[in-house]
Amino acid sequence: MVSQRRDADAPKDSPKSILESLAGTRVLVVEARYYDDIADELLAGARAAIEAVGAEARVFTVPGALEIPAAIAILMDAGRKAGGPYDAAVALGCVIRGETGHYDIVAGESARALMDLSVAEHLPLGNGILTVETMEQALARARVSDMNKGGGAAEAALSLLAIKRAANLEPAR
């Protein structure tokens, strides 16, 4: 029989304990503001999740979801070269299906590029690019008071960072 470890028994370097000590962590947030109301909600949720652990968010804006992966790659590289690297990244945006195949390209290629970047660079990255059928679906997923996908994306990035630190791949600041 496999037993589940209680939180009190968790080692000090477990992802949970590291997640609780992320003060000073620098999180890069790149948002596409194609739909301002949705972008506002996604960003509010992400900021709240980042600030809840004492981390710092640095926000950059791009025109659309396809530009997000390139912007993250550019900004991560710039941060390393400037001596102030980011510890994690969050992608925020929204793609709503229209009448053409453009949706499939934007949704698929942005997700693929983010995954490729995350895996190749060992980058803790939360994907908060919504891919939905309608504006109503987008608003429900974006609203902090509803599904809070912006907050969820930030929490995913922070959780991956905690795992990376627990594996001793990146020192805590």
Curated annotation (Swiss-Prot):
Name of the protein: 6,7-dimethyl-8-ribityllumazine synthase
First-level EC class: transferase
Pfam families, alphabetized: DMRL_synthase
GO cellular component: cytosol; riboflavin synthase complex
Function: Catalyzes the formation of 6,7-dimethyl-8-ribityllumazine by condensation of 5-amino-6-(D-ribitylamino)uracil with 3,4-dihydroxy-2-butanone 4-phosphate. This is the penultimate step in the biosynthesis of riboflavin.
Record EC number: 2.5.1.78
Entry binding sites for 5-amino-6-(D-ribitylamino)uracil: 34, 65-67, 94-96, 127
Annotated positions binding (2S)-2-hydroxy-3-oxobutyl phosphate: 99-100, 141
Family designation: Belongs to the DMRL synthase family.
Keywords, alphabetical: Riboflavin biosynthesis, Transferase
InterPro entries: LS, LS/RS, LS/RS_sf
Catalytic activity: (2S)-2-hydroxy-3-oxobutyl phosphate + 5-amino-6-(D-ribitylamino)uracil = 6,7-dimethyl-8-(1-D-ribityl)lumazine + phosphate + 2 H2O + H(+)
GO MF annotation list: 6,7-dimethyl-8-ribityllumazine synthase activity
Organism: Methylorubrum extorquens (strain PA1)
Active site: 102
UniProt keyword annotation of DNA repair present: no
One example of a Gene Ontology biological process annotation: riboflavin biosynthetic process
Family matches, as CDD domains: Lumazine_synthase-I
Keyword hit for Nucleus: no
Pathway terms, separated by semicolons: Cofactor biosynthesis; riboflavin biosynthesis; riboflavin from 2-hydroxy-3-oxobutyl phosphate and 5-amino-6-(D-ribitylamino)uracil: step 1/2
